[in-house]
């Protein structure tokens, strides 16, 4: 019997090898990088600048190691060429993966990722991972289903190639908001996704600022929760705002614990809460403000900004209550329409986000500042690989 004809690959297929993101090139690694001072402030957190008319996101350089990271592991191991640690990136956020690899002094592993003409995903590792400690950097960001499936197939490929350990590094964990039933006959999709990642062959998950703490319990494998607050705190501290002028605001009751912890680290600033009622998905109505913001610089903190309805209505209320300036801070910038229109409408002095999700050029606006989490993720990966403490990074 004749063998079946091979399926054709779509013309839009792409590869996540070292050439997949030509627009953002990491600086060359220096053999003396391990001896750099760690007291220098992070300078990757400047607002976006225009280069030849196009927005440019600052990338890591030799002076960009944030002060809260003091890695003895980096000093002793960053230049080891015989490490059994392998970093791979999916196609969801290759720029972040490149920055993480640069910080760690490693090259991204070579992997071919393509799409068949019918939309199916093809993954082939182009180097051996046998006996290696493999870390796959792939946020399950929009399009969530496609990026999730790509992650699962990459995990499966590593497992079948005899990797010793496989860690799924998920800067943004899609479906995290579907963490409980709010009505009858609903799915708990966060638990389902956790099961899929586990069954695919992952031994560990590393995730940034999960929407709710209980999501960690949905996994039957260890989960390292990376808190990105130090990155934002470091940036706010560099702005020189008087501590007596600050107030941290939670945009809803569910984020009070997060905002309280943030306020304590931000010069023990006072806390305010926006009480709102949600009548439908992606629709929020601001009802009341608990706390005093008159004449203050209000820092609104949330784990993510999706349509920006909650945080924008909260900012409007803060201005009505006499706030001098309002800053919006979040880890995950989902930016579903009409988020950009709302955020750039003038309610915010600055919108501070991180690069756990890639931000399309069309979504850049004047008040936007993008902070890099690459140092934090790279340090966490080293410590997981070394069986060292991760929680000590955030103490």
Swiss-Prot record:
Highest taxon of source: Eukaryota
Composition-biased stretches (Low complexity): 1-23
Gene Ontology CC: chloroplast; cytoplasm; ribose phosphate diphosphokinase complex
Region described as Binding of phosphoribosylpyrophosphate: 295-310
SUPFAM superfamilies: PRTase-like
Enzyme Commission number, as recorded: 2.7.6.1
Record's subcellular location: Plastid, Chloroplast
Transit peptide: 1-42
PROSITE patterns (alphabetical): PRPP_SYNTHASE
A biological-process GO annotation: ribonucleoside monophosphate biosynthetic process
Primary location recorded for the protein, binned into one broad class: plastid
A single MF term (Gene Ontology): kinase activity
InterPro entries, A to Z: PRib_PP_synth_CS, Pribosyltran_N, PRibTrfase_dom, PRTase-like, Rib-P_diPkinase, Rib-P_diPkinase_bac
Enzyme class: transferase
Entry similarity comment: Belongs to the ribose-phosphate pyrophosphokinase family.
Name used for this protein in its record: Ribose-phosphate pyrophosphokinase 2, chloroplastic
The species this protein was found in: Spinacia oleracea (Spinach)
Encoding gene (name): PRS2
